[in-house]
Regions:
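Catalytic cores of peptidoglycan-degrading enzymes
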Residues: 15-146
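Extracytoplasmic and endomembrane cell-envelope/extracellular-matrix remodeling and assembly machinery
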Residues: 1-13
């Protein structure tokens, strides 16, 4: 069942221009082991928005909250099921403001930007999956999907 209608909007639209990205999907990057010299090369699986601690994160589209809690690397995290196999994930939050089982509307505040998990500073990391495959969230901001 499709739970959204219309376009997806930036989850950082409450505080940032839609092009205020600090790291884009697919960028090569090195993950830093906090407190160690560990460096792991990898593929960036989401879209990072700059921003200060405590700024509002909003739902890019309507959906059902299927996870809200802490993850080791991702920190405080929220996952929304938008239906039709489309899921959004929001990592590193300073505070989660929704609960599992809650239906959220587009633009609803779901959490606050933070620096939890494995990070070098406060930011919003947004991931998007379609039928279990990670895709570039930016595509969903600039195109309309059925």
């Amino acid at each position: 069942v499709k739970l959204w209608s219309g376009d997806f909007y930036s989850p950082a639209s409450a505080y940032a221009e839609s092009t205020y990205f600090t790291s884009r999907y697919g960028n090569r990057r090195t993950y830093i082991g906090q407190g160690t010299d560990l460096r792991i090369p990898g593929f960036h699986t989401g879209l990072d928005f700059g921003g200060g601690n405590g700024l509002a994160i909003t739902a890019p589209a309507a959906g059902l909250v299927v996870f809200a809690g802490p993850w080791t690397v991702r920190g405080n995290a929220t996952v929304i099921d938008h239906g039709w196999g489309v899921y959004s994930g929001f990592w590193h939050q300073s505070a989660i403001q929704v609960q599992v089982g809650e239906m959220v509307e587009q633009y609803q505040v779901i959490g606050l930007v933070g620096g939890t998990g494995r990070v070098t500073g406060a930011h919003l990391h947004w991931e998007l999956w379609v039928n279990g495959i990670q895709v570039d969230p930016l595509d969903w901001l600039i195109q309309t999907y059925p």
